[in-house]
Amino acid sequence: MLNEKKPVEQLTETEAAEELAFLVTELARHDALYHGQDAPEISDADYDALKRRNDLIEELFPALIREDSPSRKIGAAPSLTFQPVLHARPMLSLDNTFSDEDARDFVAGIYRFLGKLPDHSIAFTAEPKIDGLSMSLRYENRKLVTAATRGDGTTGENVTANIRTIRMIPQTLPADAPDVVEVRGEIYMAKSDFAALNAEMAAQGRPLYVNPRNTASGSLRQLDAKVTASRKLRFFAYAWGEISAMPSDTQFGMVETFKAWGFPVNPLMQRLSSADELLQHYHHIERERPDLDYDIDGVVYKVDRLDLQARLGFRSRSPRWATAHKFPAEQAFTRLKGIDIQVGRTGALTPVARLEPITVGGVVVTNATLHNEDYIRGIGNSGEPIREGRDIRIGDMVIVQRAGDVIPQIVDVVMDERAEGAEPYRFPTTCPVCGSHAVRDINEKTGKVDAVRRCTGGFVCRAQAIEHLKHFVSRHAFDIEGLGSKQIEFFFESEDPTLSIRTAPDIFTLERRQEASLTKLENIEGFGKVSVRKLYEAINARREIALHRFIYALGIRHVGETTAKLLARSYGTYEHFRAAMVDAGSLAGDAWNELNSIEGIGEVVARAIVEFYKEPRNLKVVSDLLEEVRPESAETRVSTDSPVAGKTVVFTGSLEKMTRDEAKAKAESLGAKVAGSVSKKTDIVVAGPGAGSKLDKARELGVQTMDEDEWLALIGG
């Protein structure tokens, strides 16, 4: 990670902006892997740590909060396999708590936000957090009309036909149900049904499924509803979206209503009145967890009264009145059989542990991530000892941790079980794929050695070249249907010059080369006339492409989808962008300064872009690519109607018509950034009685000031 995990409070403003840009890209990538592809590659705990770091930086540097910040997002974009459904009300995710202390802070924060209320006067509900797939069921005139996944929270996937096969979901509602109601909850697969399904797969000699959650998700996304029907999916109802008439004024009452309408609800849900009671129920559910016939990963707390929920409102991606108290990660012991090295698109050598099969949290684990060379040696990202400095050696008895549906990780070693004479692991200094030197670069900014060892072979390295091509055709880049991983590997390995694809421009010359060839692609096993025709159509459909997609597809290190959009908006055309990057090559002058001044582009990212354009081989590939495709000019950003959107606001003094938290939440919901101090970047200071130095400084700097009534008039109440 950037800044070597420097404490947030020690970051400079430039470093903070740089790291926020990195976190946007990194979290968006993991969101897509988890929500869109059901293929997460980091643990829930690591993901949550990235989110917490992002939130801490934004809290200290509110002026740097980006429009595409992870704090404003919910999940990943929906797949194109099913028709999109626009949710009438967004399906928000929940903030997480990880300790009893965090849970107490959640309760205390509710009381602080709402103001003067007696202790124990606010009731809460507590229920298991089901590890499944979020679902919204829309009923009109008491008939099920649409079922949609959460997707990115705003737009989901229409899976109505498949949902109709789940017997425990009502097709119609009783006569007393509202005309319009969206019942929301979780689709899951019972552990017993999962075990039976895998037993059936084993009997047929077919590959086993990994875990119930991924199996439920895959089952729900089947194009053939008969397959879904055979998978015995289940449902728990616990929330709602659009509803034409409220049947209750409490969370608990709403869930009881769902039960009366025929929906399954969780029997472990309780209504409680204090943090102590919530924690008591949390630990009760934690003890019951192994015996439940469904996977859970925590307990959800919600304020019970709906009028208080309305007052508390929402953050950009989550309700303020609810939180998910997560369980600790599950662990098990097994033997490390070996360490394999994988080579990624940027040349990173990633060690992966081969383990004796072990069941962790109901899932058979055979591989685990080892992160990097230092992690194996017992050294953390900042050079600090981890595992008390214990290294990891082949043959060791290790502790494996699985947190969520991800590649597990080795968290410790049982030293008493280490074999006498076991040798320390020697990380390779050459690429296992191409034999090129593998080096650990020096970070020019920090002077520290990079934690990752990288192959220097570049496009000479088969692994890097193939991964570059896979990235180029991926969904957020050129998105060429029919060019998946297997097809890319086939074309790359082909020795026929009319079939070979070694660099991105080769994709767009394939059809021309095939016209003059006797070896027709349509005659090769796995292809046919129809599939080849569709492949050429998909390739030709991408000869004009959005500028940000083009930049992202180049595979420049540190340039993710979000950074590519920033660059596209800032430079407008590819010609302008390329010329500016070449001019910035000296790391000085107007072009370099302009690049670094883009909000969200820090020095590390800027250097990576400039270095890309210094490499003649990259320039040749891009030049050849531009002979085949045309990047479109970037669209200008659409402005919002809110009078305070994009403005930085500071509240000071006492507010009489709302609490400070309510004022902040309202401002942020209108697109404003709320800061804690006044600076030249401040646009508005809202001053109540008792305003002091902040108001004085605002006047000194010429910042617009107003009282609470003027503020409410400005934002429309």
From Swiss-Prot:
Transmembrane segments: none annotated. Residues 639-717 form the BRCT domain. It catalyses: NAD(+) + (deoxyribonucleotide)n-3'-hydroxyl + 5'-phospho-(deoxyribonucleotide)m = (deoxyribonucleotide)n+m + AMP + beta-nicotinamide D-nucleotide. The keyword GTP-binding does not apply. Its EC number is 6.5.1.2. NAD(+) binds at D44, A45, D46, Y47, D48, S93, L94, E127, R150, E186, K302, K326. Keywords: DNA damage, DNA repair, DNA replication, Ligase, Magnesium, Manganese, Metal-binding, NAD, Zinc. Zn(2+) binds at C431, C434, C455, C461. GO terms for molecular function: DNA binding; DNA ligase (NAD+) activity; metal ion binding. DNA ligase that catalyzes the formation of phosphodiester linkages between 5'-phosphoryl and 3'-hydroxyl groups in double-stranded DNA using NAD as a coenzyme and as the energy source for the reaction. It is essential for DNA replication and repair of damaged DNA. This is DNA ligase. It comes from Sinorhizobium fredii (strain NBRC 101917 / NGR234). The gene is ligA.
